[in-house]
Amino acid sequence: MRIDVISLFPEFIAQCAAFGVVGRAQERGLLELKGWNPRDHAQGNYRRVDDRPFGGGPGMVMLIEPLRACLEVAQAADARPAPVIYLSPQGRPLTQPLARELAQLPRMVLLCGRYEGVDERFLDQAVDMEISIGDYVLSGGELGAAVLVDVVTRLQDGVLNDAESAAQDSFEGPQGLLDCPHYSHPSSHAWGDVPEVLRSGNHGAIARWRRQQSLGRTWLRRPELLDEATLDKQDRRLLEEFRRELAPGDEK
């Protein structure tokens, strides 16, 4: 996959993508990440990329022409078609199903806004989709772009050392439930012991426990996800057992 990022701070994205899963994906040739700076395509001695908004008001608005020229160069760098995605709090919420859709693309172009935003005419003419990573406002779209790069990259074939790792993540699978708790060594600690079932070696019992914990944790923390999940009789039985066994105060 190739991801082009249009940003006034392309080095920010490069730094975020240099580590962990995304860094390994680039080393393995599974991800090509390229940053483009609109300031390189601005005119005049000051290479201005923003100006005051019509109608007055605070802040500055990113100008059409530097963005248009930058996008033109970015799109010409690879022959494959690429949707232009603007990171915006007004966009479609980034979810795991949406991430899976985007992960199937061979290429995408991410646009990071700054200041009060981008001239609406550019968004109308050049942007295919707006995506939001949450109901809050950041100083710019770079953090959102870094999140999207990470989410999409880890879904590429061969990126994770264990493909099952992604399949067992929260929001994955047909039900989209939260993940179950995980434990490692030591089995006994001052802060608690590992559940006995996980040390039993009984794979059937372990699978049942994990499924029940996934259902229960979703019910406790994100109950609205259960409204869209397709649960069979066994799932409903496991969830009911979880509810009955829940100790007072554990609802947190």
Curated annotation (Swiss-Prot):
Top-level taxon of the source organism: Bacteria
GO biological process: tRNA N1-guanine methylation
GO MF term list: tRNA (guanine(37)-N1)-methyltransferase activity
Cellular component aspect of the GO annotation: cytosol
Keyword tRNA processing attached: yes
Protein EC: 2.1.1.228
Keywords on record: Cytoplasm, Methyltransferase, S-adenosyl-L-methionine, Transferase, tRNA processing
Main location: cytoplasm
Xref: InterPro entries: Alpha/beta_knot_MTases, tRNA_m1G_MeTrfase_C_sf, tRNA_m1G_MeTrfase_TrmD, tRNA_m1G_MTases_N, tRNA_MeTrfase_TRMD/TRM10
Catalysed reactions, as listed in the record: guanosine(37) in tRNA + S-adenosyl-L-methionine = N(1)-methylguanosine(37) in tRNA + S-adenosyl-L-homocysteine + H(+)
Cystine residue pairs: none
Alphabetical list of Gene3D superfamilies matching this protein: 3.40.1280.10, tRNA(m1g37)methyltransferase, domain 2
Chain's role: Specifically methylates guanosine-37 in various tRNAs.
Quaternary structure, from the entry: Homodimer.
Protein's name according to its UniProt entry: tRNA (guanine-N(1)-)-methyltransferase
UniProt organism field: Xanthomonas campestris pv. campestris (strain ATCC 33913 / DSM 3586 / NCPPB 528 / LMG 568 / P 25)
